[in-house]
Amino acid sequence: LNQSVLICDQVSPILKEVLEKNGLKVTYEPEVTPEQIAEKIGNFEVVVVRSRTKITRELIEKADKCKIIARVGVGLDNIDQNAAKEKNIRVLNAVEGAITAVAELVIGLMLSMAREIPRADREIRNGNWIKKELMGTELKGKYLGIVGLGNIGKRLGRLARALNMNIIGYDVTEIDEEFSKEVGLMKADLDTLLSSADYVSFHVPLLDSTRHMINADKLKLMKKTARIINTARGGVIDEDALYNSLKDGNLAGAALDVFEVEPATGNRLTTLPNFVATPHMGAQTKEAQLLAANVIAEKIIQVLRGVL
């Protein structure tokens, strides 16, 4: 496999090791700029990114030798897939890597809201012991609506079932029957799910059909005691509509790991007391990054060998 690989973002060292063991020449430049990529992309058969680097049509047009663009992660919205397809470039991702990490983060975010953990921590640091004000709720017996029942959605369903939550599911494709029986899934359309659930978690890609799928009208369907979690992609929820719902008390809480504009350090949602934010860290565990790197290395090798 005497071919060259450009790794543009910080990834687990195992990726470079595995590729080099298989005879590939690897250039690791985790801080490379778009301008630098434009200058050198024409020299590589494989380009690897994570979240930071955007592989645009302009870059792809310069990628004359490129056979593969690989993302060490799940979502592919930082790669122009249409441009890649036009040049017969394979686009790979590592959905397997993030399954457990993202599902566990959702559980953490639900517990953070249910027990007001971020607020409790802040108040103690500020010298306030507000035990009596922090009357939480339990997850046991609550209804969790899962929008999108792929690998991550199903993993979340199993974890939530172990906490004795009731699972409502919606997906545009057929839902796995075995999984449905395992967790006692109640299938519903989106509107029914939104109006019934105490917590709603999103696990869908960002497409034209999912952009702002949660807008002001959809939020009005939800109970005032309900809480929303998004670890999928920022554009799935209309953040202005979400801000108004939280501010006006029409929704009890929200937790977002992903935002329409990232970094989201100046986002006005972060001024609200009933909002929890994390910095797009769903797949940011040692285990997930190691697994994703191994998965991508294996896929790259298989494609170059003509096996995949």
What are the residue ranges of the model-derived segments?
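An N-terminal-biased, well-structured beta-alpha scaffold segment characteristic
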Residues: 1-92, 195, 215-217, 221
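N-terminal Rossmann-fold cofactor-binding loop
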Residues: 9, 30-31, 171-173, 232
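Rossmann-like dinucleotide/phosphate-binding beta-alpha-beta segment
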Residues: 21, 132-224
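Short, Asp-centered acidic motifs that coordinate Mg2+ and/or phosphate
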Residues: 45-46, 68, 199, 227, ...
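Short glycine-/small-residue-rich Rossmann-like dinucleotide-binding loops
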Residues: 52, 74, 198, 204-206, ...
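Residue-level detector of alpha-helix initiation sites
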Residues: 54, 75-78, 97-98, 143, ...
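Rossmann-like dinucleotide-binding domain for NAD(H)/NADP(H)
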Residues: 87, 91-92, 177, 225-308
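Phosphate-binding beta-alpha-beta segment of Rossmann-like dinucleotide-binding domains, i.e.
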Residues: 87-89, 94-143, 158, 162, ...
